[in-house]
Each structure stands twice: as structure tokens, then as C-alpha cells.
């Protein structure tokens, strides 16, 4: 029995070492052989850019100078969407919220995008305000052969948009694809170009949103889709040096707030119906950015 236990432990250790030694693309290939195909980052970036080329980035009008943005992540929707619909109801009822963000892992496995769309449409729209939801893909949205489903429903996972206040203040929101733990060469160049352009504009704030976080203080997700140390350093320095104020991410299903110089990095809680403490974030964006976490009631 002890020999079997040792063999099992050594096997897990070997798999972990292989994952740690591989780059993100190689990890994705290995995972894909087990749970279904997932196109690499550069391929997904090209798919997103095809849509972006025909659909200009949008400007959303905020109702007030100090507006609110609702942020959720990791809904992992199957046929249950209690927390998801509570979130939709909350942001649609808030007249100061012109836009909401979903940071990925929208669905849990294949064939559940219809459940996402139907449950979204079941909540009445508020005719007194804009109703915009901006999303990016997470690792569950690209594996299990789901990238095509994501594209069919949400079109792009790399883009930016602008929120403009009544007095003409403009805030830039950059949404990027980190679903397999790397931006890839093409998207990294896009990010550099976008931030160089942004530095020449007069944006009040720059906000970024994506699925995978930079810092991990627990091992709940193992090493799934984490950045390499080198890419973490590159992106942190790029974001900090180009004036990104705050970065919203998900993935680890655990709340965390980390400061890197003037850059605030926030991991937002997950919002699955199975969570014991599901929550989302509400950011108030004015001359400064404040935020609070909102705990959801657990599913009855």
C-alpha cells in the first residue's frame, strides 16, 4: 500500500514539475489533450481583432461625474444562475451604473452559453439608463472547445472602451485576454501600442480588466493558467509606468487586494451558486476610484 501511495505522490510531483517547466502554450496543449481543444492566445487575439476591425471601440455616456461600475467574475454557469441574476438585477437597478464587467469563466463547461444569454435576458432592462455588459474570456471559456461559442455570443476578448462624464471627463477601460496565462506576442504588442496611445490622451483614469491575476497567495487553482515570472514582471512594469490606476481580475475564487507602486491589483470573489461567500465589486469612479465588495445571499 505504501508503495502505491509513493508512486501516486511521485506521479503528481512529476506532472507538477512538467507544468511548471512548460510555457503557457505548452501547458494549454497538455490540458487540451485531456479536456478538449483550446486555441492559443495569438490565435484568439486574431479572432478578436477581426471583430474589432469592423466594430469601432465604443464611448459610453455616464449619467454623473462620480459613476459606478459593477464587476463580477467566475460565475461558472451551468443550469443554475441565482447569483448571476442577482448581480444583473443590482446593476440594472442602479441609475449611476452605465456599465458592468464580467472577468471570465462565464460558463463552466460546454453548451451552457444559451443558459447565460437566456438568464441575462430574463431580468428586465431599465429604460432610464444605458445597459452595457463588457466581458472577457476565462480559462473555462476557451477550454472544452468553447472558444467558438464565446465568439458567437460575445465576439471579442481584447478591446477597450471609454466612459465619458457629463462634464467631458474620460476614463479608459482596457479589457484583455489572459485566459491561458499569457498575453502572447501579438496581444502584448497591442497592449504596448494601446498604452502608448493612451499616454498621449487626457484620460482621467485608466482601468484594466482580465481573468488571470498576477499575484497568487493560495494554491486553490494550482498552476493552471498562471503567468510566468518574466511576463508578470513585464506587465506590472508596463501597467505601472503607463498610469493604469486599477486592475480587476478573477480566477482564484478568493478576494485579494495588492498594491504595486501606484497600481492597485484586485482579485474579485467568485460568484458561483455553490460558493459559501459569493460576492461582487462595485467601484465608484470620480476624481479618485473607491470600491467596495458586496456579499450576495447564498442560494436557498
Label every model-predicted segment.
Residues 34-54, 112-204, 225, 231-240, ...:
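Extended active-site neighborhood of metal-dependent phosphoesterases/phosphodiesterases
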Residues 207-214, 245-255:
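Histidine-centered catalytic micro-motifs
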